[in-house]
Structures are given as structure tokens and as C-alpha cells.
């Protein structure tokens, strides 16, 4: 997997927003939560993820570079809110009322659960398979390789036929 280098100016913008939002939360909540670790190694179509045990946020470098300010304004507060909610409330629903409150009241950001960034550059290659009902099924590289090695078979949900690779 090719490593994507995030420009230093973008890293600085991410850090600035993270610190501003964390300071805002600490002031509102009368707490002193530490700055979380940031990693730029999130893969696939996920923009970011929060790891409570490590107090860490992982960001998708490709989506960050492609969406810059929109990414920073949406994803950084979103993932920070997950960490803050886990510390402040304990184990609760990931996008429940506590998270929504943290986003809208404490961080003063719109509580959106999903991003709407263009994912064409981070979408994995898929392979076309067919069944008896002529539906085309797209299998990921991992699933395709398992079929090719004879480790597994996949069936159509409708006709229950074993999927067959369409030779291109």
C-alpha cells in the first residue's frame, strides 16, 4: 500500500482545529482532557475513526488532501466528539444523543453522521460475478482472492446460486 504524504500546512491546519475544539470542550465541560494522538493511516472510504483506548484519531490522508477545509471542519470535530463522549459519558451509542449534544452544544458544529466526499480515488477495485438470475455482484479484491484460492464460495441472496467470475 502506497503511503500518502500529507503536506505540513494541512497537518498544521488539522492540529489548529483539533486544539481549538479541544480547548472549547475543556472550557465548556470544565475538564482538562489531553490532546489525542493523530495518525494519518485510515484507509478505504472512511474519513476518520476514533480509538477510545488509545485516545487516538485516525484520518484518511487521501480524503484530507482532496477535501482540505471541508474535511477539517467536519471530520476533526466529529472524531474528537467520539473521544470526548467516551470519556465524559462512558459507553453510549456512537451517534446517540450524547454525541449529538457534544457536537452541537459543546463543539458548535452540525452533527452529521456521514461524509459526502468524493470517494472515487479511495474505492477499492472490485470484480464482477454473476449468478443464475443474471444479477451482477461486485466482490472486493479480498473476497475475489478467497474464491480464486478455493477457500470460499459466495452465493446470490436471491437465487442462492454460487457466484461465477465474469471473464473480462
UniProtKB/Swiss-Prot annotation:
Gene Ontology, cellular component aspect: cytoplasm
Subcellular compartments: Cytoplasm
Any GO BP annotation: response to stress
Cross-referenced InterPro entries: SprT-like_domain, Uncharacterised_SprT
PROSITE patterns reported for this sequence: ZINC_PROTEASE
GO MF entries: zinc ion binding
Domain SprT-like: start-end pairs: 20-166
Cofactor field: Zn(2+)
Sorted UniProt keywords: Cytoplasm, Metal-binding, Zinc
Principal place of residence: cytoplasm
Residues annotated as catalytic: 79
Keyword Signal set for record: no
Cofactor notes: Binds 1 zinc ion.
Keyword Ubl conjugation (UniProt): no
Binding site residues for Zn(2+): 78, 82
Protein family according to the UniProt entry: Belongs to the SprT family.
Name of the protein in question: Protein SprT
Organism expressing this protein natively: Proteus mirabilis (strain HI4320)
Amino acid at each position: 500500500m502506497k503511503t500518502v504524504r500529507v503536506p505540513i500546512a494541512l497537518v498544521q491546519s488539522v492540529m489548529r482545529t483539533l486544539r481549538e475544539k479541544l480547548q472549547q470542550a475543556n472550557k465548556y465541560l470544565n475538564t482538562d482532557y489531553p490532546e489525542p494522538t493523530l495518525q494519518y493511516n485510515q484507509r478505504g472510504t472512511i474519513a476518520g475513526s476514533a480509538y477510545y483506548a488509545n485516545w487516538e484519531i485516525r484520518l484518511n490522508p487521501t480524503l484530507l488532501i482532496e477535501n482540505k477545509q471541508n474535511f477539517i471542519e467536519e471530520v476533526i470535530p466529529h472524531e474528537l466528539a467520539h473521544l470526548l463522549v467516551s470519556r465524559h459519558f462512558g459507553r453510549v451509542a456512537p451517534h446517540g444523543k450524547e454525541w449529538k449534544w457534544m457536537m452541537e452544544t459543546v463543539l458548535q458544529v452540525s452533527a452529521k453522521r456521514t461524509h459526502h466526499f468524493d470517494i472515487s480515488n479511495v474505492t477499492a477495485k472490485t470484480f464482477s460475478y454473476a449468478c443464475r438470475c443474471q444479477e451482477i455482484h461486485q466482490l472486493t479484491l479480498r473476497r475475489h482472492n478467497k474464491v480464486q484460492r478455493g477457500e470460499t464460495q459466495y452465493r446470490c441472496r436471491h437465487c442462492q446460486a454460487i457466484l461465477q467470475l465474469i471473464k473480462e
